[in-house]
Amino acid sequence: MELLLLSNSTLPGKAWLEHALPLIAEQLQGRRSAVFIPFAGVTQTWDDYTAKTAAVLAPLGVSVTGIHSVVDPVAAIENAEIVIVGGGNTFQLLKQCRERGLLAPITDVVKRGALYIGWSAGANLACPTIRTTNDMPIVDPQGFDALNLFPLQINPHFTNALPEGHKGETREQRIRELLVVAPELTIIGLPEGNWITVSKGHATLGGPNTTYVFKAGEEAVPLEAGHRF
């Protein structure tokens, strides 16, 4: 399988998806036809989200079709060379994909060789479940099971920083709480600016920041770019 799982879409001082474009270009390998899954968009219309994505990827020669705009979305996915899943609200994303019967077709086409690109919620959707999302509002997706294209759980936008005076839990504390009730999980705290690529059977960490792996009853393990999972 070929996957590009990004923690986020925008870095300070850079345009939207600017840091991701070289990574996308490297993994295209001649693929040009993409379907875009815009359902995580809550505060922007799906048409606008699709147009924004298409404009950014046009210089790479990628044509983008919004899955919400086609008559037969399952067929569109089955014939896609690239599946792109945008960030936003993970619950809404999974709910829409499940209701439209898109989860199995996405899994199948990626396993047959299509490239999967997802940022934030799109990275969450590639995991076994969406239980490590940070998102609100919460809508009921009729279960948390997701695509299971990547075998570990990703927590995008990972940071342990707290505003001065804030008394709420750190992100690590929240992850530790999840590991108490679900000790079987392995969770990757993926900071903004970092990503995971899967190619030729290897998953590799990229990006400038330290990533952390959390398991129940164990200390967090720091990982740097180049680590293979």
From Swiss-Prot:
Catalyzed reaction equations: Dipeptidase E catalyzes the hydrolysis of dipeptides Asp-|-Xaa. It does not act on peptides with N-terminal Glu, Asn or Gln, nor does it cleave isoaspartyl peptides
Entry annotated with the keyword Calcium: no
UniProt keywords, alphabetically: Cytoplasm, Dipeptidase, Hydrolase, Protease, Serine protease
Pfam families according to UniProt: Peptidase_S51
Top-rank taxon, per record: Bacteria
Subcellular location, record wording: Cytoplasm
E.C. number: 3.4.13.21
Main location as per UniProt: cytoplasm
Location of the active site: S120 (charge relay system), D135 (charge relay system), H157 (charge relay system)
GO molecular function, one term: dipeptidase activity
InterPro entries: Class_I_gatase-like, Peptidase_S51, Peptidase_S51_dipeptidase-E
GO BP field: proteolysis
Entry coiled-coil feature ranges: none
EC class of the enzyme, as a word: hydrolase
GO cellular component: cytoplasm
Family per record: Belongs to the peptidase S51 family.
Function: Hydrolyzes dipeptides containing N-terminal aspartate residues. May play a role in allowing the cell to use peptide aspartate to spare carbon otherwise required for the synthesis of the aspartate family of amino acids.
Protein name as annotated: Peptidase E
Protein encoded by which gene: pepE
